[in-house]
């Protein structure tokens, strides 16, 4: 029985999973959009949204808490100074997952995870990229 089991194993050890989520969170914060497999994107969403919710009320304790989850100071600065302010009035739902077909080698489902109301010029338009991949 799977009762009260949260999250996905992603077929890796717990330390690998924690490191992977932290690294993916840093990439998402810096680039505001990343391409990954669908299960990883679904695991990353609550992880990053919890960090942004904390960052809405910035103080030293919050900064240290976020820094304990992700070890990149640039990403922590951006979460607290930019993303926390950007989503101050939004009660959750800071990210969106856009499905983008399947990977060529192993047919793994691929998705883009991005911030809602992100800077479009920071990276390519996810909807155009998804449509181009579907056509190919």
Curated annotation (Swiss-Prot):
A matching Pfam family: Ribosomal_L17
GO molecular function list: structural constituent of ribosome
Cysteines engaged in disulfide bonds, as pairs: none
Source organism superkingdom: Bacteria
GO aspect biological process, one term: translation
Entry keyword set: Ribonucleoprotein, Ribosomal protein
Entry's Gene Ontology cellular component terms: cytosolic large ribosomal subunit
HAMAP family: Ribosomal_bL17
Protein family per UniProt: Belongs to the bacterial ribosomal protein bL17 family.
NCBIfam families assigned: L17 (TIGR00059)
Subunit structure: Part of the 50S ribosomal subunit. Contacts protein L32.
Name by which UniProt lists this protein: Large ribosomal subunit protein bL17
Record organism: Rickettsia prowazekii (strain Madrid E)
């Amino acid at each position: 029985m799977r009762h009260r089991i949260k999250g996905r194993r992603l077929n890796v050890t717990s330390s690998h999973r924690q490191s992977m989520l932290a690294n993916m969170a840093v990439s998402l914060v810096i680039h505001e959009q990343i391409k990954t497999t669908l299960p990883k994107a679904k695991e990353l969403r609550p992880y990053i949204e919890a960090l942004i919710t904390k960052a809405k009320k910035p103080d030293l304790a919050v900064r240290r808490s976020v820094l304990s989850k992700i070890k990149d100071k640039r990403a922590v600065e951006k979460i607290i100074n930019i993303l926390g302010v950007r989503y101050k009035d939004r009660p959750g739902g800071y990210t969106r997952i856009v499905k983008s077909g399947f990977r060529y080698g192993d047919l793994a489902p691929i998705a883009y995870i991005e911030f809602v109301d992100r800077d479009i010029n920071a990276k390519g338009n996810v909807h155009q990229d998804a449509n181009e991949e579907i056509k190919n």
